UniProtKB/Swiss-Prot annotation:
Name of the protein: Fimbrial subunit type 1
InterPro entries with a match to the protein in the record: Adhesion_dom_fimbrial, Adhesion_dom_fimbrial_sf, Adhesion_dom_sf, Bact_Fimbrial_Adh_Pro
Coiled-coil intervals: none
A Pfam short name: Fimbrial
Database matches in NCBIfam families: PRK15194.1 (NF011741)
Major location (coarse): other
Keywords: Disulfide bond, Fimbrium, Signal
Top-level taxon of the source organism: Bacteria
Organism: Klebsiella pneumoniae
GO cellular component: pilus
Length: 182
């Protein structure tokens, strides 16, 4: 009896496994993976986390930006340089480029234009580690930072800057940056 039961179990197991083995394989398209980067001939490489970053300036009351020259609290952000070779260069500085809000405020980034709901009379100002507002022409570099072998953190700050009585709305801005080694 035990042998008969064991034989039935073995036959059942084989039947189930052969059914699973004969099941159709299905393949579906999954998507696309984009790989982005750059090979550079420079003293350092910009850290991947610094290349496309977002600085959250948060919500600021329009009453705080009620007059020209008023600013919000500054928010810190960093540009990190990795894999530095101090025999190639010993210092690095950064320049930002973007659209200035107007010709009399060349250190204030214009806000992105959205269809409706943008704040007015306000822009974004970028400060270097000495607290100096940086021109947004892509040619005015921050104070130089002395490089170490690895890693190097170059600190900056960003804040809202009122050019008049700010009105409420979305207040986003973009700038690009480049690094100069010496």
């Amino acid at each position: 009896m035990k042998i008969k039961t064991l034989a039935m179990i073995v036959v059942s197991a084989l039947a189930l496994s052969s059914t699973a083995a004969l099941a159709d394989t299905t393949t579906v398209n999954g998507g696309t993976v984009h790989f982005k980067g750059e090979v550079v001939n420079a003293a350092c490489a910009v850290d991947a986390g610094s290349i496309d970053q977002t600085v959250q300036l948060g919500q600021v009351r329009s009453a705080k930006l009620a007059t020209a020259g008023s600013t919000s609290s500054a928010v810190g952000f960093n540009i990190q340089l990795d894999d530095c070779d101090t025999t190639v260069a010993t210092k690095a500085s950064v320049a930002f480029a973007g659209t200035a809000i107007d010709s009399s405020n060349t250190t204030v980034l214009a806000l992105q234009n959205s269809a409706a709901g943008s704040a007015t009379n306000v822009g974004v100002q970028i400060l270097d580690n000495t607290g100096t507002p940086l021109a947004l022409n892509g040619a005015t570099f921050s104070a130089a930072t002395t490089l170490n072998d690895d890693p190097n953190i170059i600190p900056f700050q960003a804040r809202y800057y009122a050019t008049g009585a700010a009105t409420a709305g979305i207040a986003n801005a973009d700038a690009t940056f480049k690094v100069q080694y010496e």
